[in-house]
């Protein structure tokens, strides 16, 4: 599914299910979801182990929750995320051309 399709799907769902939250509520919710993703990363890859009482969370689901909120926020502000992502990739591709080495170029050095 393309980002534009995701945005349309979410917009249709939101309109049937109560409308968009306020901008600050959306930002607070995004912060909450990023925190949940960070917590799971810390449990898996960091020094903080889960308590025995804590269940297993899915990185995929936590990332999808963050994406959901970003798409909602983009819709609320009439932002075409596909177009914005295209501009960001063009910027990064130009700015960082030759900046990083790959394992293949490191081995040949």
Could you describe each region identified by the protein language model?
Residues 1-63, 67-109:
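Flexible "arm" and connector segments at domain edges
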């Amino acid at each position: 599914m393309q980002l534009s399709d995701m945005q349309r799907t979410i917009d249709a769902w939101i309109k049937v299910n109560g409308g968009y939250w306020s901008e600050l509520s959306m930002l607070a919710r995004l912060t909450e979801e990023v925190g949940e993703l960070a917590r799971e990363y810390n449990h898996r890859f960091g020094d903080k182990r889960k308590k025995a009482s804590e269940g297993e969370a899915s990185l995929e689901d936590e990332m999808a929750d963050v994406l959901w909120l970003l798409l909602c926020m983009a819709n609320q502000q009439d932002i075409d995320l596909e177009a914005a992502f295209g501009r960001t990739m063009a910027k990064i591709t130009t700015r960082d051309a030759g900046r990083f080495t790959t394992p293949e170029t490191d081995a040949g050095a």
